[in-house]
Structure formats: C-alpha cells, structure tokens
C-alpha cells in the first residue's frame, strides 16, 4: 500500500505545509509505514492537485498497487484529488481539512476528527456516489442561483484594498440581494418538466455547502439519489426570515419540507436534473463543488458508488 499526501500550501489563512509535513512523517512512523511507501507533494498552481493525483494513480496502476491519497486543503483541493483518482479502483482519497472551507466532511464528522492524521492512516474506505455535470464531477453539492451568485462575486470584492474574506462575502451578499434575485427556470427532474421563478436550486449529494449551509440534512452519499431543493421567488423580507432556517437545515425533516415552508421550498429526490433559464439568451451562475461561473444550464446526474473515500478510523467505526 502506498500513502500519498498532496498539500495545497495556499489553502486557508496560512501555509499549512510547515505544520503538516513533519506531522505526517511522525504519524506514518507511528503507524509503521515505511519511508519508501510515503510520498508528500505540495501544489504550486491551480489544478495542480488534480494533475498530481493522476500521476500518483498512474504510477500505482503500473504496479497494480493500492494507493491512499490524502488531500490537505479545502473542498476545492479535495475535489481535484478525488476526480483525479476516481477512475482507479485501487485508489481511495482522504481529506485533511486545512482550507478556508471544508463543508464536505461535515456529512460524516468533525474537523477535529479529520485532522487526526494517525486516525486517517488507520481509517476505513467507504464507497460514495458522485455527481456528473457538464462542468465536471462533484462529490458534495451543485447549485444555480442566489448562492452561486454570492460565491462568484466574492473575488471581485477581495481585490478591494483591506477587504478580507469575511467582508468580501458580506458585500457580495448585499450586491446579490439588491439585484435581480430570481430567475425563471425550466427544470427537468427525471423527465418531469416544469417551470419555476426560483432564487436557487441546490442539487445535493452531501449535506453542507457554502460555509455551513445545511441544504440537505438527510442526504446520504451512498444511496444513489440526489436531494434537490428548489427555493421559489420570495420578497427580500421573507428571504431574511427563510435564509437562517435554510442555513440551519430546519426547512426539511422526516423526508419532507416542513409545513410552514412548503409553499416556498420544494423537495425532489432525483437521479438526474437539468436546469436552464426559460429565456435562452440568459445565463445562470452555476456552482459545482465551490467552483462558480456563468453557464447556459446546470445538468447533473448521480453516478452511484463511483469514488472511494477514506474516513478516519473513529468516524468509519461509527458509520459501520
């Protein structure tokens, strides 16, 4: 078995590699892993983690070896590594949460549990579903609408002097809420077609996204089903009331939308989802596991048990 760590040193607020490299070596020694079976690499450019993961699984495949690859960074780094490794059936991918956003792991456990490197090295492997979209694969959540607009707008405000991440996020929210919030969408869910004026549509494999929004509190990553949440057009005053409920995951319980929100939020279990603006000349901002941009559509389908995830031993034992 080979153990391969890919560290994104610019994820989060400081260079985590200075802490992680010696800690990884210490944990590997404690777990009896030989130096020859351990590789540690640092990324140095966008998408580098994906390239390094492809290289690692290619080398393992040549020797017909099992390999565990750990992505140290945020959800973006994890997605790059996972999609780079998912086509090799003897590869499994773990996540060390050292980024500014680590929503994916919340579907399984806590940041502290996933930061325990020894427990990660002793962990178990769980097969999970993936979402296939026109913009690539996602493990967690894809969306279109207000939430994606906010995330897409953050970099613009970060370029303003003395405007940090938190302030940029707040300014982007204000800009989106004061602009055109809803889009008339054509939605196709497993062949069932309808139109809605919606502020957002979330297509969920995992439960959390957007820095802690619990969009799909009962979603399972291994059930072959996407949990689709459609939030219909509402006034700014109602958004202020509904948003905290949606963030806390209190819009959904026992397999259905709670009665007080059933005219605002709709839920659909799905295998495939296709969303596009009714106006063919209009685009929608699309989010695929945190990567956002304008597009003509969001097309998503579930790919059952298509990736292998490493869970820390304590987390894995609780799952079994």
Could you describe each region identified by the protein language model?
Residues 6-8, 96, 231:
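Short hydrophobic segments within beta-strands
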Residues 189-190, 220, 230-320:
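ATP/nucleoside-binding phosphotransfer catalytic cores, i.e., glycine-rich phosphate-binding loops
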Residues 1-69, 115, 316, 320:
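ATP/NTP phosphate-donor binding region
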Residues 143, 147, 202-216, 292:
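Glycine-rich phosphate/pyrophosphate-binding beta-alpha loops
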Residues 9, 72-74, 98:
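Glycine-rich beta-strand-to-loop/alpha-helix junction loops that act as flexible
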Residues 158-168, 212, 217-240:
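Gly/Ser/Thr-rich active-site loops/lids in small-molecule metabolic enzymes
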Residues 43, 87-199:
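Catalytic core of DAGKc-family lipid kinases
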Residues 77-89:
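Short Gly/Thr/Asp-enriched flexible loops that form oxyanion-binding sites at enzyme active sites
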């Amino acid at each position: 078995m080979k153990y391969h760590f890919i560290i994104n040193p610019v994820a989060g607020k400081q260079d985590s590699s200075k802490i992680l490299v010696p800690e990884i070596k210490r944990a590997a020694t404690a777990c009896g892993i030989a130096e020859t079976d351990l590789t540690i690499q640092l990324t140095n450019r966008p998408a580098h983690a994906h390239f390094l993961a492809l290289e690692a699984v290619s080398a393992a495949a040549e020797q017909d070896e099992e390999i565990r690859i750990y992505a140290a960074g945020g959800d973006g780094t994890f997605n790059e590594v996972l999609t780079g490794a998912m086509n090799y059936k003897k590869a499994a991918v773990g996540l060390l949460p050292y980024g500014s956003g680590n929503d994916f792991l919340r579907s399984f456990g806590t940041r502290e549990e996933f930061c325990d490197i020894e427990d990660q090295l002793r962990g178990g492997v769980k097969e999970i579903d993936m979402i296939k979209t026109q913009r690539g694969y996602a493990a967690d959540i894809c969306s279109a609408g207000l939430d994606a607009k906010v995330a897409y707008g953050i970099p613009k405000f970060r370029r303003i002097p003395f405007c940090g991440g938190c302030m940029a996020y707040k300014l982007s929210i204000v800009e989106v809420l004061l602009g055109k919030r809803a889009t008339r969408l054509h939605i196709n869910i497993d062949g069932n077609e309808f139109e809605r004026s919606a502020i957002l549509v979330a297509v969920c494999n995992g439960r959390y996204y957007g820095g802690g929004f619990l969009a799909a509190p009962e979603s399972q990553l291994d059930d072959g089903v996407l949990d689709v949440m459609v939030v219909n057009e509402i006034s700014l005053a109602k958004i202020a009331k509904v948003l905290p409920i949606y963030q806390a995951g209190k819009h959904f319980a026992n397999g259905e939308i709670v009665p007080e929100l059933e005219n605002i939020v709709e839920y659909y279990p799905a295998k495939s989802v296709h969303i596009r603006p009714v106006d063919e000349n209009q685009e929608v901002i699309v989010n695929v596991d945190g990567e956002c941009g304008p597009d003509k559509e969001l097309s998503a389908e579930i790919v059952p048990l298509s990736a292998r995830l490493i869970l820390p031993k304590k987390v894995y034992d609780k799952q079994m």
